[in-house]
Amino acid sequence: EIFGRYKIGSILNTMGENCPDREWMRNVMAQIQEYSIKGCGIPCIYGLDMIHGASYLAEGTLFPQEINLGATFNPIHAHNMGKTLAYETRSMDVPWVFSPVMDLGRNPVWPRQWESWGEDAYLQTVMSETEMRAIQGEDRNSIGTYNTAACIKHYLGYGVPVTGKDRTPAIIPDYE
C-alpha cells in the first residue's frame, strides 16, 4: 500500500545490523519488488551503502577503508574491492550500491577522513574510477550479471568542513 500511495521508486537502506545471509536478503528483495510492482507498476531500485566491501552481509568480504587502500597507491586493490563488493551485493539481489566515496579528505580533523582515498585529487580519480569500473563492469551501456550500479558519495566539498565536524558548512575558495 505504501508503494502505491507515496509512489516509492527507490530505497536507500543503511541497515542497523547485517543481514544474516544472502537468502534472507533475496527474500526481502522479492517482497519489496512484489509490493512495488503491485503498488506502482514498476520495480523499486534498492541500494545499500557499501564503501569497503559487502558490509551489510554477515558473510560478506570486508576490505580496508579507502584511506588505507589509497595509501598503497595501487589501483588493483580498488579493482578487487569493487569487483568483490559488486559480486557479493548482487548475490543478494541488490542492484545498486553507494560507493565509492569521491570526496577529498582535505581537512585532517574531519571525522570521516577514513572514508576517502585521501587528499590527492589524482589518486582519488584513479582509485575511484578503477573501483567504479569494477563495480559496474566495463560495458558502459549495461550492468553485467555480476555487477551493480554504483553511485558516488560525498562528491564535492563534504571533506572540507570549516569546523572539522561532520555535516557542517564548507567554504571552498575559487582557487581550490
Question: Which stretches of residues belong to each language-model region?
Answer:
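Glycoside hydrolase catalytic-domain context in secreted enzymes
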Residues: E1-E176
